[in-house]
């Protein structure tokens, strides 16, 4: 039965308007984005199939077009609707850390870095460049691949910092395994970067490791001082 045939007020869009989005299940929220069903499935059934196939809402939104379109009822148009929702969220997050924004909210930084790095299938080492008042200058992805003490070059970090005239930095990288716990190599990299940056009087404020559902902060663990 299509959602249009449901009793008045019971469809996901009606429930969202009446009760708020927080009262909807993941499948119902996804159904609102999909708008309608296909191949004999209503939008909620299609959304449930997507979640069951990929294992969760986040995994659905991170899936590629070819992966999504393999499922019955899904095509390029519905994939585009999902990607647009992801992009809107990403752009709002990026606006919150736009150039000149004073970085005073740790949760804002965590949210931004999580959105930037969590769903990468490979490791990315990035740097958030700040001025002397901790206003954002730029977010830059520096290295990709296997991040270890041999693949992160302090001289490249120093060169970028000098070029952008940064006074402080936050470095970060992701663990595609989903486990955010820092490795011994992560700690060695941090020490090398801290020493290199100190030679040009630039502060390393934090090193954040992004996992599947959490971020580990070196500063919070007392590993930066």
From Swiss-Prot:
Zn(2+) binds at residues 173, 175, 186. Residues 102-224 form the MPN domain. Pfam families: RadC, UPF0758_N. GO terms for molecular function: metal ion binding; metallopeptidase activity. InterPro entries: MPN (IPR037518), RadC_JAB (IPR025657), RuvA_2-like (IPR010994), UPF0758 (IPR001405), UPF0758_CS (IPR020891), UPF0758_N (IPR046778). CDD domains: MPN_DUF2466 (cd08071). A motif (JAMM motif) lies at residues 173-186. One of its GO terms (biological process) is proteolysis. Keywords: Hydrolase, Metal-binding, Metalloprotease, Protease, Zinc. Signal peptide: none annotated. The keyword Protease applies. PROSITE patterns: MPN, UPF0758. It comes from the Bacteria. Belongs to the UPF0758 family. NCBIfam families: PRK00024.1 (NF000642), radc (TIGR00608). This is UPF0758 protein Swoo_4561. It comes from Shewanella woodyi (strain ATCC 51908 / MS32).
């Amino acid at each position: 039965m299509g959602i249009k045939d449901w009793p008045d007020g019971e469809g996901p869009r009606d429930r969202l308007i009446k009760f708020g989005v927080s009262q909807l299940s993941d499948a119902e929220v996804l159904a609102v984005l999909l708008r309608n069903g296909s191949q004999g499935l209503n939008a909620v059934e299609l959304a449930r199939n997507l979640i069951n196939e990929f294992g969760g809402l986040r995994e659905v939104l991170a899936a590629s077009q070819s992966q999504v379109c393999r499922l019955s009822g899904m095509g390029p148009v519905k994939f585009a609707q999902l990607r647009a929702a992801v992009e809107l969220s990403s752009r709002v997050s990026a606006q919150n850390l736009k150039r000149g924004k004073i970085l005073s909210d740790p949760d804002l930084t965590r949210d931004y870095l999580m959105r930037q790095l969590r769903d990468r299938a490979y490791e990315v080492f990035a740097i958030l460049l700040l001025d002397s008042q901790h206003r954002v200058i730029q977010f830059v992805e520096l290295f990709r691949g296997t991040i270890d003490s041999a693949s992160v070059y302090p001289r490249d970090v120093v060169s970028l910092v000098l070029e952008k005239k940064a006074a402080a930095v936050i470095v970060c990288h992701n663990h595609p395994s989903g486990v955010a716990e820092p490795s011994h190599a992560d700690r060695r990299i941090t020490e090398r970067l801290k020493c290199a940056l100190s030679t040009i009087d630039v502060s390393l404020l934090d090193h954040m490791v992004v996992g599947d559902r959490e971020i580990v902060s070196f500063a919070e663990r007392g590993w930066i001082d």
